[in-house]
Amino acid sequence: MDRIIGYMISPLLCKKISRGLSAGRVQSVAVKLVVERERKIKSFVSEEYYKLYAYLKNSKNLPLTLQVTHKKEKIFKPKNKNKIKLAIDILKKIDFFVINSFEKITFSKPSAPFTTATLQQAANVRLNYNIKKTMLLAQQLYEAGYITYMRTDSTHLSQDAINMAREYILKVFGKSYLSKKERKYTNKNNLQEAHEAIRPSYINIISEKKIKNLKLDAQNLYNLIFNQFIACQMMSAKYNFINITVKADNFKLHTSGRTLLFDGWIKIMPLLGQHYNDKILPILKIGEKLKLIKLIPNQCFTKPPVRYCEASLVKELEKKGIGRPSTYVSIITTIKNRGYVHTIDNRFYAKKIGEIVTDRLEESFNELISYDFTAKMENNLDLIAINQQYWKNVLNIFFKKFLQKLEIAKKDPKDGGMQLNKSVITDIDCSICKKKMMICTTSTGVFLGCSSYTMNIKEKCKNTINLIPKLEILNIIKNFNLKKDILLPQQYCHNCNTIMDCYIIYGQHNIFYICGKNPLCNGYKIKKSNLNHIITTKCKKCSYNMYLKQGCFGNYMLCINDTCKNTIKILSKSDIATL
């Protein structure tokens, strides 16, 4: 089914939008996730707000810090300085009393042993491996006999595996670290349970010496799998949790914290970042009066949604029931290769062609890239695999609707067919033939191309001008500590009031704004800029200026000194490489 969908829609996309494009039942949904997140980030407007912290002490002079969370039973989140100053003036004059104070013991259980998806996520977050690298290394470990099969949805462990893990814990860590009962993890419905969870094959046979003979990347992945396997049979981590609520007239203040009492499984699988959240707080009596030391306001700004990384994209696909362990690598590889998305610092950014393809599929094949439909179809395919559904019935129901929509999409846009990816004519003259340049969007990016190339004439002009996306420029000028909001302010289309995409015209360094609805809307703006003088650096060989250039391998800096011609590659992490 997936192959037929791809074979039928992909030629249509190539004809209507651009060459080299493809669509698929799962890959198109993955692109849609990235595009929707991209648009939320673009449309996000940061808002100022304030947090207010009160530094108090009790009768024994033990200090504690609480946040003012409520005023008159409503969340306290003032959006300007005047309101925060008014609150400070009131709080300075009133008393603080404890209205709630309790402590309790909490436990944190270990996660299940790895499935394919959770291994990909953990390796991405903990080891910074992309999922393609993770699966390649896992394949090598499996072929060498170090781990069990690495394509599985199951968290199930055999009894032999459980015994093996528990014997290791007892021997290495002692009885206090061994969970009192065997931990057995259940699976979701319709998952591929032909294999166990991913685990070391035989930890008693595979010595540390053998592991050390592996390449470092393979060692790290094996150790991650090993540690998670052992951790799943260890004792829970034990915390002392304390919660304190204080009242001051109409205001409520709150703080909480936990202290690690026993590490348990964390001993072998340490938490990342500040997840321990150790915060020692005094035990207070209800009704106890506290003394104010000081009040500190903290200016904050709301933040846009976080971009997907490979781990979070796989997690979101898994959460929505889309795709299977064996498909995640090919999905992400395909959407990158087609030019729909690209990654910077392991974060996904939607490219313009990805937005256009998503919009056209949404218009012509809305069911195909619906999250619910894709998950339901995935479930039906699983039922077919276990003979609970007849495959012809499932496919016939789908293809009857699909073929009808395909025939409509093939029609001319005037007759309700899929919209074309039209080029938008601009007022910019071609430097070669003096005809007008037009905005073009393909799988390789957005650029200006001469309009005579599309005319029915013998000598077609192939002149093009590259457009550098705002993101790439901001990455470069970070080296000069410039304020990006002054250099590249957000603009709205004068035709439809949509947020405009920002580019720099290569060679001119003028700012070029294109309507976010392009090519359906032909709105654009050109603004002069001094970026030509900003995007420079000194050559370390001859001290001449170096200017931004574009090559087939990306952006780089080139020395203008003809006798030097030194180049410096601009790294993906936005920094200019040092010689």
Regions found by a protein language model. Give the residues of each.
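Phosphate-backbone binding and catalysis cores of DNA-processing enzymes
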Residues: 1-103, 197-254, 259
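Conserved short loop/turn motifs at secondary-structure junctions
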Residues: 18-22, 103-112, 122-127, 150-159, ...
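Basic, low-complexity terminal or inter-domain segments flanking catalytic cores
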Residues: 43, 84, 131-132, 153-579
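C-terminal accessory/connector segments of nucleic-acid motor ATPases
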Residues: 44-66, 100-137, 448, 513
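Positively charged, polyanion-binding regions of nucleic-acid-associated proteins
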Residues: 93-109, 294-300
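Short acidic, hydrophobic short linear motifs in intrinsically disordered regions
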Residues: 98, 110-123, 148-150, 304-316
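Short glycine-/polar-rich loops that comprise or flank the Walker A/P-loop
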Residues: 144-145
